[in-house]
A protein has these predicted regions:
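Topology signature of small-to-medium multi-pass alpha-helical membrane proteins
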Residues: 2-144
């Protein structure tokens, strides 16, 4: 169940990263939002954009690493899984807050954001205790 969730989560993450950044690739959109001389300029948008790139790159790399740890039955898997789950729980509202301070007119707390937070909370409430307490987890993830 965990392995299936990791793979589906990774594919969903790749899709959402592609959807998020596609409008900025090979277009003048980023320039129009970061050029001080244009009326579409948004102060600090470039910083927000780079932060989004870094966080999303981190998430993609960590998700791929988690899949590797899972299939190699590494002892590190439960700890990294818990770390990433907690990171996502903190990153979603933090990202929304930072975006709302940079773009005050943007509606950052929307249906999708609330859904993501509740999905992460629900997933964390189930899988974090399982990773910490399960004898099966301790017996499966034994490789160094």
């Amino acid at each position: 169940m965990v392995g299936f969730g990791l793979i589906i989560g990774f594919l969903k993450l790749i899709n959402s990263v592609h959807t998020l950044f596609k409008p900025y690739i090979n277009t003048d959109l980023l320039n129009s939002l970061t050029n001080v001389n244009l009326t579409t300029y948004i102060p600090n948008f470039l910083m927000l954009f780079y932060m989004e790139v870094l966080v999303n790159a981190f998430m993609v790399l960590m998700s791929a690493y988690l899949i590797y740890l899972y299939f190699t039955k590494s002892k590190k898997f439960p700890k990294y899984y818990i770390f990433i789950t907690l990171f996502v729980l903190l990153a979603i509202p933090m990202d929304a807050y930072i975006a709302s301070t940079i773009i005050p007119t943007a509606e950052v707390i929307d249906k999708d954001m609330v859904k993501s937070v509740f999905q992460s909370l629900f997933s964390g409430a189930i899988w974090i205790p399982y990773m910490l307490k399960s004898l099966r987890v301790r017996n499966t993830f034994i490789e160094d």
